[in-house]
Structures are given as structure tokens and as C-alpha cells.
């Protein structure tokens, strides 16, 4: 199978490496210098340092060539760009006049200014593209790059997209499950990043494992309430793309969002943290969108509100925790 991966960040690179073990895979990035480095060293030293990529993996900075590679009905196009760059990439795809038959995206979050989920952005920019879906689940790019076991879910209304994605990814140490709850999968992937900042703050303040468990559990309730209000199914949030991804991101040391919380608890400013991180922390980007949607649907999301207070309103991390503890008692 021919597979084009658009976006050579950590996640796009790791997935391309996995795909190249079985398929004719082309990894695209608009940065010609990055592509030249990949071609010379078969390593993404900028985003996935120290992990050798398969010799069979090919690289290109020409979007037209990448789209042509993944356009056919028996091929697949994987969008690896983050949510912040998704609309720009989709418009470039539209302008190229080469819309792939099957598209799957792996970004997580809400578009910051519109509060739209990725599938809504894709519907707006590529309305003629109907065989598409989201691939998500508890996964760190570095572990996938190392070939360690991982389980993901592809969700799509299109049976053809589910089958094509399954055929591409389900091999080696990667197990793929299928479903059709695109909204639920996307909401889980977005909200868990905000909640991971909360658990990072709690851990950074030394509040203990009891507090971590409480935040994860009550955070899952927040995720589910918002997801159902937006059209997702409640059972999705107890699966890989809800609870599974939340546990990993809230507790794993490779989690950028958890790192943001830990550093905030230590007293560092958000600007300093993001500058040193060098990678996207989607929880910071989409926290305000999550809270705005909660308010629009009259949904209580106190943990999310506390995180936004720390990130954007100057609330001290310890004061944010105290505010959560002062909330009135209620039935679970």
C-alpha cells in the first residue's frame, strides 16, 4: 500500500517509521532543511532524536508529490499536522487540486479561535472528501518510534476509511481497534490534555496519589459530560481514546502537558515553560476552547476552569487546588 504522511513532527515521524516497515511510505514536511536532514541521516534529530528510521522510508518537501503518492483509492493519506496548522495544510491540499481518496488525521485538540474539532475543520475545507477519520489513543511518539506495543482506535463514519487505516497500521507492535464515534474520540483526545496539566500541578505540589486519582476520575466525568453534549457517546470515554489516553497523559513522564503542570507548580511562568519545551503542548492551546464550549452548553467543568485560571488569569496553582477543595459536597 502507498501511504503519505503529511507532517514530520514527532508523531508524524514515528507513525511514518511504523508504516514504512510494511508499506511504501512517503513523509512530507514543508521545511526543506528538515527533509534534507531526514534524507541524509534517516533520523529526525529535531523532533525524535536518537531513533533510527527505516531505510525504506522516503521523504519529500513537495506537497503535490506527497498528495499524489497517497491519493489513490488503494492508498492512504495521514495528516500529522497539529490542530493549529490543520486548516492551513487543508487549504494547501485544496489548492493542489489533489484530494486523497482516504484521509485519517492524528491531531488532538480544538481549533483555538473557532472552537471546532478537527473533523469540522476538514468538512469546512475539504467538503468533497468523505472517506476520512481520526486515529487516536494512548500513545507517546517516542515509544512508537522505538517499536514498543501500542493500541489505538480509528473512528470514522466511512467503512472504507476504517478498513484502509486498519490495513495500514495494524501490524508489528501496533494494535488497531475500529469505531464510528468521531466526536467522542476527538473530544477525549482534546480534553485529556487539559486534565493532564491539572494532574501535573497536583503532583508538582506534592499532593499525593490520592489527589491524582481523584483528578483523573473527576476529570473523566468532565470529559464525558462535554463529549456527550457535543454528540459523542458516553461509552467512548471509558475506552482507549478517553480513559486510556487520559491515564497515559496524566501520569506519563513523556507527557508535555503533564510537564507544563509540574513546572507551573514549581513557580515557573507559562512563557518560560513553553519556550523551554520546544514542542506543542495542546492542553495550553485548547484549554480556553474547552471551557468556552462548557459554558456554551451549561456544563460544569471545575477542573478545566481551575487550569484556565492558572494558565491565563494569574491564579496561583495552590490557590486553584484550594478552590476545588472548597466546592460544595454533592452526589457523585
UniProtKB/Swiss-Prot annotation:
GO BP terms in the entry: carbohydrate metabolic process; glycerol-3-phosphate biosynthetic process; glycerol-3-phosphate catabolic process; glycerophospholipid metabolic process; phospholipid biosynthetic process
The pathway noted for it is: Membrane lipid metabolism; glycerophospholipid metabolism
Q: Name one GO cellular component term.
A: cytosol
Q: Name one Pfam family in it.
A: NAD_Gly3P_dh_N
Q: Which residues form the signal peptide?
A: none
GO MF term list: glycerol-3-phosphate dehydrogenase [NAD(P)+] activity; NAD binding
Q: Where in the cell is it found?
A: Cytoplasm
Q: Where are the transmembrane segments?
A: none
Q: Active site at which residues?
A: 192 (proton acceptor)
Catalyses which reaction? sn-glycerol 3-phosphate + NAD(+) = dihydroxyacetone phosphate + NADH + H(+); sn-glycerol 3-phosphate + NADP(+) = dihydroxyacetone phosphate + NADPH + H(+)
Alphabetized UniProt keyword annotations: Cytoplasm, Lipid biosynthesis, Lipid metabolism, NAD, NADP, Nucleotide-binding, Oxidoreductase, Phospholipid biosynthesis, Phospholipid metabolism
Where is the major localization of this protein? cytoplasm
EC number(s) reported in the record = 1.1.1.94
Q: Give me the residues that bind NADPH, please.
A: 11, 30, 108, 141, 256, 280, 282
What the protein does comes down to:
Catalyzes the reduction of the glycolytic intermediate dihydroxyacetone phosphate (DHAP) to sn-glycerol 3-phosphate (G3P), the key precursor for phospholipid synthesis.
**Family classification:** Belongs to the NAD-dependent glycerol-3-phosphate dehydrogenase family.
Among PANTHER family, the record links this protein to: GLYCEROL-3-PHOSPHATE DEHYDROGENASE, GLYCEROL-3-PHOSPHATE DEHYDROGENASE [NAD(+)] 2, CHLOROPLASTIC
- HAMAP family documented for this protein: NAD_Glyc3P_dehydrog (MF_00394)
Q: What is this protein called?
A: Glycerol-3-phosphate dehydrogenase [NAD(P)+]
Organism of this sequence: Burkholderia vietnamiensis (strain G4 / LMG 22486)
Amino acid at each position: 500500500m502507498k501511504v503519505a504522511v503529511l507532517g514530520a513532527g514527532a508523531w508524524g515521524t514515528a507513525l511514518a517509521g511504523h508504516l514504512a516497515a510494511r508499506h511504501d511510505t512517503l513523509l512530507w514536511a514543508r521545511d526543506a532543511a528538515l527533509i534534507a536532514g531526514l534524507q541524509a541521516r534517516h533520523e529526525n534529530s529535531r523532533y525524535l532524536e536518537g531513533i533510527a528510521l527505516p531505510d525504506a522510508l522516503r521523504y519529500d518537501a513537495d506537497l503535490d508529490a506527497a498528495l499524489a503518492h497517497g491519493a489513490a483509492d488503494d492508498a492512504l493519506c495521514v495528516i500529522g499536522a497539529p490542530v493549529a496548522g490543520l486548516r492551513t495544510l487543508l487549504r494547501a491540499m485544496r489548492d493542489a487540486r489533489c484530494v486523497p481518496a482516504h484521509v485519517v488525521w492524528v491531531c488532538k485538540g480544538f481549533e483555538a479561535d473557532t472552537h471546532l474539532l478537527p473533523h469540522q475543520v476538514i468538512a469546512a475545507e475539504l467538503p468533497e472528501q468523505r472517506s476520512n477519520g481520526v486515529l487516536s489513543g494512548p500513545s507517546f511518539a517516542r515509544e512508537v518510534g522505538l517499536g514498543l506495543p501500542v493500541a489505538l482506535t480509528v473512528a470514522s463514519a466511512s467503512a472504507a476509511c476504517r478498513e484502509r487505516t486498519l490495513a495500514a497500521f495494524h501490524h508489528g507492535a501496533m494494535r488497531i481497534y475500529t469505531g464510528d464515534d468521531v466526536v467522542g474520540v476527538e473530544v477525549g483526545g482534546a480534553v485529556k490534555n487539559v486534565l493532564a496539566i491539572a494532574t501535573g500541578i497536583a503532583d508538582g505540589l506534592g499532593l499525593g496519589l490520592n489527589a491524582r486519582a481523584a483528578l483523573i476520575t473527576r476529570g473523566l466525568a468532565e470529559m464525558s459530560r462535554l463529549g456527550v453534549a457535543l454528540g459523542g457517546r458516553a461509552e467512548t470515554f471509558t475506552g482507549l481514546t478517553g480513559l486510556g489516553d487520559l491515564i497515559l497523559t496524566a501520569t506519563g513522564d513523556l507527557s508535555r502537558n503533564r510537564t507544563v503542570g509540574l513546572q507551573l507548580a514549581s513557580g515557573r511562568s507559562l512563557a518560560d515553560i513553553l519556550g523551554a519545551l520546544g514542542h506543542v503542548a495542546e492542553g495550553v492551546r485548547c484549554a480556553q476552547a474547552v471551557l468556552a464550549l462548557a459554558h456554551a452548553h451549561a456544563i460544569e467543568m471545575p477542573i478545566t476552569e481551575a487550569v484556565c485560571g492558572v494558565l491565563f488569569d494569574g491564579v496561583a496553582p495552590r490557590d486553584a487546588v484550594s478552590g476545588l477543595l472548597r466546592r460544595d459536597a454533592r452526589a457523585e
